[in-house]
Amino acid sequence: MTGVAVPHRAELARQLIDARNRTLRLVDFDDAELRRQYDPLMSPLVWDLAHIGQQEELWLLRGGDPRRPGLLEPAVEQLYDAFVHPRASRVHLPLLSPAQARRFCATVRSAVLDALDRLPEDADTFAFGMVVSHEHQHDETMLQALNLRSGEPLLGSGTALPPGRPGVAGTSVLVPGGPFVLGVDLADEPYALDNERPAHVVDVPAFRIGRVPVTNAEWRAFIDDGGYRQRRWWSDAGWAYRCEAGLTAPQFWNPDGTRTRFGHVEDIPPDEPVQHVTYFEAEAYAAWAGARLPTEIEWEKACAWDPATGRRRRYPWGDAAPTAALANLGGDALRPAPVGAYPAGASACGAEQMLGDVWEWTSSPLRPWPGFTPMIYQRYSQPFFEGAGSGDYRVLRGGSWAVAADILRPSFRNWDHPIRRQIFAGVRLAWDVDRQTARPGPVGGC
């Protein structure tokens, strides 16, 4: 992978504006709607809106120093500290009104664009890229919240997607063994977040990985075969949670064979990647299928490494920026594309749809790469590393249909609790090259 130039100020301005336009579309509802909490897992949309502005002001106008005075009074600003106020509590806080939040965000953005325009050409612009990423990540969070909303739909059914391709579901590709470069440096990706860095060489034995993510039809076969009722496919923690939560199918699947998506009740497309499954469900499905979940290191090698050239690709298909012909990104579709829809987006090993569509659970806990150095926002990764005391997390890779193309790359690492399923997460299987069958455990019931 060759180094990537730091974006020019005009390109940064474009990214900031695109992110804000997307945010404003997601909050283009009346005040009562923006103040609602659709689920205790999520914030009211008006909290996300003001938090986006608060973080932008903190990092781009105040140098990341909360002691420097800002536009908000300290007592108001602390309402938007995600570490102080858990999501379930935010609906009860004396938040800015929707009109106040919009004005605050607009005032901050105007000052930020002025500051960007005055920056010297050789200035460090990492904080600007970090803020773009932060806003887009909250946009995806707001889409999760809107998907949990009950009542008449607020959003349409999404833009059209290319058709899938028969014969790819359930197939796998070989990833040769050997060393590869895991992670990136800032010279490779100027806005790579701290947990993606530094680049370093690791050796990975040969393995096979699913050509495409697991589909709804494949998941239906798991259900019909009693996969949710058979203890043998589940880990101890997974079975305990499956019984506690009464899991019988992916979230938003209805007993009549339909699903509910952003308030729309519709047939479940058999060739779409399954989404809204927990890590525990993904793990159980993999065991039932005679497979396993990939490690995140395996996933990144399958996505980015080109053994023919002995170097990383910037994207699975090469170094060219994502387009609508290569991946389903940006959120407009409001759903994953059918498997096989993007053959031109395949990685060097032949894996398809590795960026976009659904986040993919891996078996890996979140750990720092050797030589990890925290970025200016030191609380982004460190509190969530394994052993840091904030809970159990598993890494997800690849982004989803809701992720913006400006911020996604093969090295991007997401993470969540293994019980979360409101996220747009699915499954891609992996196999050791010398093992293709499951090893059933004990049978049991709840």
Swiss-Prot record:
Pathway involvement of the protein, from the record: Amino-acid biosynthesis; ergothioneine biosynthesis
Effect of D416N: 200-fold reduction in affinity for gamma-glutamylcysteine, but no significant change in that for hercynine and in the reaction rate
Catalysed reactions, semicolon-separated: gamma-L-glutamyl-L-cysteine + hercynine + O2 = gamma-L-glutamyl-hercynylcysteine S-oxide + H2O
Alphabetized UniProt keyword annotations: Iron, Metal-binding, Monooxygenase, Oxidoreductase
Gene Ontology MF, one: iron ion binding
Co-factor(s): Fe(2+)
Binding site for Fe cation: H51, H134, H138
InterPro entries according to UniProt: CTDL_fold (IPR016187), DinB-like (IPR024775), DinB/YfiT-like (IPR034660), EgtB (IPR017806), EgtB_Actinobacteria (IPR032890), Sulfatase_Mod_Factor_Kinase (IPR051043), SUMF_dom (IPR005532), SUMF_sf (IPR042095)
Gene3D superfamilies linked: paralog of FGE (formylglycine-generating enzyme)
Binding site for gamma-L-glutamyl-L-cysteine: R87, A88, S89, R90, D416, R420
Subunit structure: Monomer.
Family statement drawn from the similarity comment of this UniProt entry: Belongs to the EgtB family.
Function recorded in the entry: Catalyzes the oxidative sulfurization of hercynine (N-alpha,N-alpha,N-alpha-trimethyl-L-histidine) into hercynyl-gamma-L-glutamyl-L-cysteine sulfoxide, a step in the biosynthesis pathway of ergothioneine.
Protein name: Hercynine oxygenase
Organism: Mycolicibacterium thermoresistibile (strain ATCC 19527 / DSM 44167 / CIP 105390 / JCM 6362 / NCTC 10409 / 316) (Mycobacterium thermoresistibile)
Gene encoding the protein: egtB
